[in-house]
Amino acid sequence: MQKSNIVEYKGLGRRKSSIARVKLVPGSGKVLVNDRQPENYFPNKLVIQDMMQPLVLTKTAETYDVYVKVIGGGFNGQAGAIRLGITRALIQTREDLKTDLRKAGLVTRDSRVKERKKFGLYGARRAPQFTKR
């Protein structure tokens, strides 16, 4: 089996219940999310801007092709997971980018997840109405 010379950088991102596996390959700036263009995958442009933030911040949007496989969650959670995956892959390319990315708050994983519903309550914290008499 012959090993290829193509360099690729991988990053894993998680947000809420979404998991994104990101692969950066030196190229022309092509982006595919689950084998589709981001404009065809995500419902609005703000989500795409949120997803592309690490590449725009480091001025590497035209340097790498981005291939993403993302599962679970909604569109905002998926965009956040992709953003973290891209950030981690970029740090593998050049370690000096980490300080700029950290200042923008992109390196830290957002660990907030939906709180579970408890029995005896209507939701995670909403209790039945209290009656005094």
UniProtKB/Swiss-Prot annotation:
GO (cellular component) term, any one: cytosolic small ribosomal subunit
A Pfam short name: Ribosomal_S9
PROSITE patterns the record matches: RIBOSOMAL_S9
A molecular function (GO) term: structural constituent of ribosome
Family annotation (SUPFAM superfamilies): Ribosomal protein S5 domain 2-like
Transmembrane segments: none
UniProt keyword annotations, A-Z: Ribonucleoprotein, Ribosomal protein
Family membership noted in the UniProt record: Belongs to the universal ribosomal protein uS9 family.
Protein name (Swiss-Prot/TrEMBL): Small ribosomal subunit protein uS9
Species of origin: Ureaplasma parvum serovar 3 (strain ATCC 700970)
Gene: rpsI
